[in-house]
């Protein structure tokens, strides 16, 4: 699960790079005094509610809450009656290095890496100190993080639609902001391809 999130994070980064404008410096956006915090791929995306990127709109507490919600929803699904039917087995092997390097991180590290990736990808700083008190780096290689997981396109789509989007909306992100400043990264074909089938 941790590696899937890492993969998601990396894929999101790749997508954001592809979707971003060329304004990677820290100068204010044209016609505004808004100076984005980060330099990640989603820095140039703008939320409908604020005309700022997701990180600058929602902040650290919201990102932690959404991240924890994604993890909780995913673990509840694979541990519940549906089991691995929709998400596959990748989340059931977190912390089991015998399944391959993509699974080596324990659950806490997986969660921290996912959070750092999401923060960076959506316009925040390149590294964060997470709720566990440890420092995590956001820029990650999604393809490498998902090697051996054999995630299918339908599993990926299910994860985004049934774990990620509800985690966002349950934590106060409007549908308009999901569409404007979160979805472009995870729905990008190149980002998805960096995770699926590895």
Residue ranges of model-derived segments:
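Bacterial N-terminal signal peptides that target proteins for export
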Residues: 1-8
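Repetitive helical segments and hydrophobic/amphipathic motifs
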Residues: 11-12
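C-terminal motif of bacterial Sec signal peptides marking the signal peptidase cleavage site
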Residues: 15-18
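Bacterial signal peptide processing site
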Residues: 20-22
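Core of compact, soluble alpha-helical bundle domains
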Residues: 26-198
